[in-house]
Amino acid sequence: MLLKTSEQKPRRAALPTVPLAADSGLVLLPLTEEIVASVVPTAADDPPVDGFYELATGVAEWARRQSMDGDVAYLHSEFFGGGGFHAAMAWRDGAVAWGPLFTATSDGEAEDHYATVTDLRDMAVNVMLRWWGVQRADQIDEFTAAGLSRCRWTQEWAALIAPEPPTAV
């Protein structure tokens, strides 16, 4: 889950996030089983949102509510050997504001509702990040410019979450 923060709309609740590219205002909330269970205890039993492999309906509802404090996006990216797929959707002010969009690099990479694109810059996550104002500048794409290429797996991202400072006794 990607969160876009701003000084105008600070988040009400502290979440276990990882800061992304400097000055981007973007943080990543790795959706590990533990984190999902802490924010949506029923998510393990929830069906996925239509079209998505792993976005549980309860997590989508939680994202919708979180978007009252700033933009929220769900990103799913799977690539191996230059081929793969993206799925993305974003919420703003309590409603779906962008997507969902499902893209793949070739036919057969994902289910039939995924559009095949020939330019990686047209993959769903890149398109959504452009909608948020991320510019690729000299990077290969917006995914890399945002700092999302730093880790490949959710657990790698979770290991980057800064531990909470100890509380005074």
Model regions and ranges:
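Short, extreme N-terminal segment that most often corresponds to the first beta-strand
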Residues: M1-D23, A159-L160, T167-V169
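Alpha-helix initiation/capping motif
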Residues: K4-S6, P30-V36, Q135, T154
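Short, intrinsically disordered low-complexity segments
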Residues: L15-F102, D107-A115
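Long, compositionally biased intrinsically disordered terminal regions
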Residues: W98-V169
